[in-house]
Amino acid sequence: SITSNTASSGGGVCVGDGTFTMNGGTISGNTVTNCGGGVTITGKSGKFTVSGTLTITGNKEGTTENNVYLTGDKINIGEDGLTQDARIGISTLGGQLQFATGANNDALDYARIFIPEATKQGYVVIRDTDGNLFLTEHQHNWTYALKEGTTDTIIATCDATDCPITDVV
């Protein structure tokens, strides 16, 4: 466990151009004033290899959840892969990006493992056919229908499986 640290960035772990490998374990309860409450990768060639059942949650930038701070494709899922119980909060400088490679286990729900900390802005995790993971804005697929039992109320429902909106509009 890496816990209860305070820093300007990378409260738990700060990596420049090296590689940090984490096979299980926990990084939590760390606080920063800048970015990467749990882990930050600052260098252009820096990488973070993850596998097993690991947890990187509960780290903060001030009072805001900020666990693994990414500026690009920095995470590699190791040969042993992740378990469905792994939880990794992810933050970015802003917007959409590819953040991981090696997500090749079709039995895993990577959107439950990697938790976008920008969910209020509608960001979700998606996987392409090559095993790359992306943090991207959710794309709604709206369907419209009359509300059952009425003739004047239309309901809208997003049919996309990763939709952050759970209420019928």
Give the location of each predicted region.
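Right-handed parallel beta-helix
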Residues: 1-4, 19-31, 49-58, 78-82
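Extracellular beta-strand/beta-solenoid scaffold signature
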Residues: 6-14, 31-42, 62-72
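Cysteine-rich, disulfide-stabilized extracellular repeat modules
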Residues: 9, 22-23, 35, 52, ...
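Periodic glycine anchor positions in long extracellular repeat architectures
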Residues: 10-12, 18, 25, 36-38, ...
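Thrombospondin type-1
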Residues: 18, 138-169
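A generic structural signal for beta-strand entry/edge sites
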Residues: 36, 47, 65, 130-132, ...
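Extracellular/surface-exposed low-complexity segments
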Residues: 51-142
